[in-house]
A protein has these predicted regions:
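Loop/turn elements at helix/coil->beta-strand transitions in domains of secreted/extracellular proteins
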Residues: 39-43, 128-129, 223-226, 260, ...
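Short, hydrophobic/aliphatic alpha-helical segments
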Residues: 16, 76-92, 256-259, 468-475, ...
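N-terminal glycine-rich phosphate/pyrophosphate-binding loop and immediately adjacent elements
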Residues: 2-138, 294-297, 307-309, 313-316
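FAD-dependent oxidoreductase catalytic-site/capping-region signature
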Residues: 2-18, 133, 139-192, 197-199, ...
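Conserved redox-cofactor binding core of oxidoreductases
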Residues: 76, 120-243, 247-249, 311-334
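Glycine-rich loop(s) and the adjacent beta-strand/alpha-helix scaffold that form part
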Residues: 35-38, 42, 50-52, 236, ...
Length: 547
């Protein structure tokens, strides 16, 4: 059946509606598709990107080949960041089955107990640490075995390094951190972690374990799941205060699908855009952008946040790093090592040693994340590829950044990307933590376990000797950790977009389930918390629809 709207033929699907339409087959959407269909609900899963057929999606280090490709990456670019010397930053976001879990750095980091207990203090019942821990454990299959913290038997495989690539250098970083005075830990996913440890990664043996691998593929054979790739959602169908379905483009066709409930899982840079394109947002702002107001909800697109990362680079000596393995004939050797033994540089992740430190002694929990990797980038190389001489990088990230940005549509045209800014390092506390974090990383490099192997500090270098100089360096080189969150904030106040059950306030049949609902930032990488949120949301949706 074809109806006309603004001169465009809209093809309406069969009258039989779905129970749930999930927009986005990413870290959250794949989990929802699995859990909801497992409970007998009929689900339509829409993904704007394609299938993750390319082999590089599944090789751990292969993400470096996939980022930035228009077919697989949204390639969001911010407006000039005033506090970063007016630089515009690229924000990589997966546009493929699995979403960013197919192109991220694979780190499995939950954050601190205090992050979630703070949400409960904000009035969000059921989001404290003790309430969300079962959902972390439910999804996880920790290779070392389950315990009170880790799960076993879940769909998502999580493991420590198997062959421990560049182990001598990585071990020395951990030892040096203890020599400096950080606690010695083995697991940074305990409720209150402080100290550095070898990474836990979403891998199954040698391969990446994305949510497409873990959750979606096992559900694809179910008759009550329909998956459509290349389906770019244009907006929601709203009727009498309820979300009745979605309108999406599939090739040259504009299609409509109807459902009892719609769930936006398109991520913190897409979910608020879809809401605003549908007339849900701040009324004055929508009218200024030429969008008809359907539901005034002023918090949409506000509270945007992300982890800012600032790198240090060292030239190392007398010890092996990844730099030497990725040039010339050595790269061919590494490919053989990967396929024959599941070892070598292709198993490496951006944070092979990671963990947390407490900069302010009075802080309730650690306030800085450090991520170390055994290579340094060549600024003159394509895609900032590794240098040829041995190197070590340490990135510092404030755990709970206070800087806030915003993202908004400036046109009713769905093809026009929204405008956004993170306002990185606009807050003095974030500036303080970055400066002190760089000084901390330098002190770790000075410890006996590591100092003999540090030939030189490449950046920021000796010229950055004062706090002001370090901060200026940070403004020049800081980048996004690609953890955008908060733009459809969960809360109980007038600027909240969703309530504690992730329902869009003031509307029926509409939820948001992705990082955009975070009221405040979690301490660390966001993939694991996103999966947890989806697990919890699935239970709530099933309960409500079966009521």
């Amino acid at each position: 059946m074809c109806g006309l709207q603004d001169g465009v033929c809209i093809v309406r699907e069969s009258e039989a509606e779905y129970d749930v339409i999930v927009v986005g087959a990413g870290s959250a959407g794949c989990v929802l598709a699995n859990r909801l269909t497992g409970a007998g609900l009929r689900v339509l899963l829409l993904e704007a990107g394609g299938v993750d057929r390319n082999h590089f999606f599944h090789v751990p280090a292969g993400f470096t080949r996939m980022l930035g490709r228009p077919a697989n990456d949204w390639n969001h670019v911010s407006e000039p960041e005033r506090s970063l010397n007016d630089r515009s930053l690229v924000h990589f976001k997966g546009k493929v089955l699995g979403g960013s879990s197919s192109v991220n750095g694979l780190l499995y980091v939950r954050g601190h107990r205090a992050d979630y207990d703070h949400w409960r203090q904000l009035g969000l019942e059921g989001w404290d640490w003790d309430s969300v821990l079962p959902y972390f454990r439910k999804s996880e299959n920790f290779v070392d075995g389950g315990d009170a913290v880790h799960g076993s038997g879940g769909a998502l495989h999580v493991q420590r390094p198997v062959h421990r690539y560049c182990a001598p250098l990585m071990d020395r970083i951990v030892t040096a951190s203890v020599e400096y005075g950080l606690p010695a830990i083995d697991d940074y996913n305990t409720p209150d972690p402080e100290g550095l440890a070898h990474a836990q990664s979403t891998m199954r043996g040698r391969w990446r374990c994305s949510t497409a691998d873990a959750f979606l593929r096992p559900a694809l054979g179910r008759s009550n799941l329909e998956l459509r790739t290349g389906a770019d959602v244009q907006g929601l169908i709203l009727k009498d205060g309820r979300a009745a379905g979605v309108r999406y483009r599939l090739g040259a066709k504009l299609l409509e699908a109807r459902s009892r409930e719609v769930v936006l899982s398109a991520g913190a840079l897409k979910s608020p855009h879809i809401l605003e394109l549908s007339g849900i947002g701040d009324g004055e702002r929508l009218r200024a952008s030429g969008i008809q107001v359907v539901h005034h909800l002023p918090g949409v697109g506000e509270n945007l946040m992300d982890h800012v990362a600032v790198p240090l680079a060292f030239r190392v000596q007398g010890i092996h790093s990844a730099n030497q393995d990725v040039h010339g004939w050595r790269m061919a050797r590494e490919i053989l090592k990967f396929y024959l033994f599941g070892a070598g540089v292709l198993t490496a992740t951006p944070g092979m040693v990671t963990g947390f430190a407490r900069i302010r002694p009075e802080a309730a929990s650690a306030d800085l994340q450090l991520m170390s990797r055994p290579f340094t980038s060549d600024p003159g190389a394509k895609n900032f590829g590794p240098e040829k001489l041995p190197g070590l990088s340490i990135a510092v990230c404030p755990c709970r950044p206070r800087s806030r940005g915003r993202i908004h549509a400036d046109s009713p045209d769905p093809a026009r990307m929204p405008k956004f800014v993170m306002n990185f390092l606009s807050d003095e506390e974030d500036q303080f933590l970055v400066v002190e974090g760089i000084k901390l990383a330098r002190r770790i490099a000075e410890q006996p376990a590591l100092k003999p192997h540090i030939k030189a500090e490449l950046s920021p270098g000796s010229a950055a000797a004062t706090d002001a100089a370090i901060l200026e360096y940070a403004r020049q080189v800081a980048y996004s950790a690609y953890h955008a969150a908060g733009s459809c904030r969960m809360g109980v106040d007038d600027l909240a977009v969703v309530d504690a059950r992730l329902r869009v306030r003031g509307l029926q049949g509409l939820r948001v389930v992705d990082t955009s609902v975070l009221p405040t930032m979690v301490s660390g990488n966001t993939n694991a918390p996103t999966i947890m949120i989806a697990e919890k949301a699935a239970d709530m949706i099933i309960e409500d629809l079966h009521a």
